Design a protein with these regions (language model features):
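N-terminal secretory signal peptides that target proteins for export/translocation
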Residues: 1-12
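Bacterial N-terminal signal peptides
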Residues: 16-27
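N-terminal cleavable signal peptides for secretion/export
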Residues: 30-75, 216
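Flexible, processing/modification-adjacent segments and terminal tails
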Residues: 33-43, 47-53, 95-168, 188-191, ...
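One face of beta-strands
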Residues: 54-58, 69, 78-80, 168-170, ...
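A generic structural motif
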Residues: 59-63, 81-83, 101-105, 159-161, ...
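Short, exposed beta-strand/loop patches in secreted or surface proteins that constitute
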Residues: 68-74, 90-93, 139-145, 200-202
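Gly/Pro-enriched, hydrophobic low-complexity segments
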Residues: 151-245
């Protein structure tokens, strides 16, 4: 008989709102007495994001410019609203996959894989990063325990399905207490680091922990040197209680 993997338990209480890769992660505490099943860790993160509501304002800051935005999270739909030019980028988190589309000039259109490697607002973030496809890649591996800025985390690795991504492998660090994504790294097909997203600081708003600053670093795979360093910063938020589980 094959034993069942340890269950991931989602407990009430500490519910941080963390925008990671503009990956906005809203999660309840994720704990397990033993190392949990990696697929359960990712599933818990996806499910919790789809149950939260929040309104955030901030900016995407590059070396050359700042792009203010409003970020709305509502029951599985995450909307990034930019101005000058007006652009809405909408992420819908499903149970088996995510969808990404754009609203410009009153028109809605799908953001197809052909655009996934293009930068968002001339930053180091690409449309694929916003789509969060790596959270759905099959057969994740648990590499063990680690820490990110003193926070205990599970470290996982996912292999991209063939010819579907600019990345070959993604590694993620998931906070053991909150279930939030603390760091994400994307590697090319040769195992060379291309991009790193890391939560630098958090802040408390209306009794909830939310992102204050996330750093986005883009690397030259051949030299391993940083070629750009951008920041996603949150300066205000209203966080609503999560929707009840179905």
């Amino acid at each position: 008989m094959i034993p069942h993997p340890p269950q991931v338990r989602i407990a009430p209480g500490f519910r941080p709102v963390l925008a990671v890769l503009c990956l906005l992660g809203v999660s309840s505490a994720l704990t397990a007495e033993d190392a949990p099943d990696p697929a359960a860790i990712l599933n818990a993160a996806r499910m919790n994001q789809s149950r939260q509501s929040a309104e955030l304002t901030g900016q995407l800051r590059t070396a050359a410019d700042k792009a203010p935005f409003r970020l709305t999270v509502d029951n599985g739909k995450i909307t990034y609203q930019f101005q000058d030019p007006d652009q809405g980028i909408v992420l819908v988190l499903g149970t088996k996959d995510s969808e990404l589309f754009e609203r410009m000039g009153g028109r809605k259109s799908d953001i197809t894989p052909a655009r996934y490697d293009r930068p968002v607002r001339q930053s180091g973030i690409t449309y694929e990063d916003l789509a969060m496809k790596f959270l759905y890649w099959p057969n994740p591996k648990l590499l063990g325990s680690d820490s990110v800025r003193t926070r205990a985390a599970w470290k996982l690795e996912m292999q991209a399905p063939r010819a579907t991504s600019q990345y070959g492998v993604a590694r993620v660090w998931v906070d053991k207490q909150s279930g939030a994504l603390l760091r994400v790294e994307g590697f090319d097909d040769s195992g060379r680091l291309r991009r790193r997203f890391e939560v630098v600081s958090a802040q408390k708003v209306d009794g909830e922990w939310i992102l204050k600053q996330m750093r986005v670093e883009t690397f030259d795979p051949s030299t391993r040197k940083v070629v750009s360093r951008d920041y996603l910063e949150i300066d205000g938020a209203t966080v609503a209680a999560p929707s009840p589980a179905p």
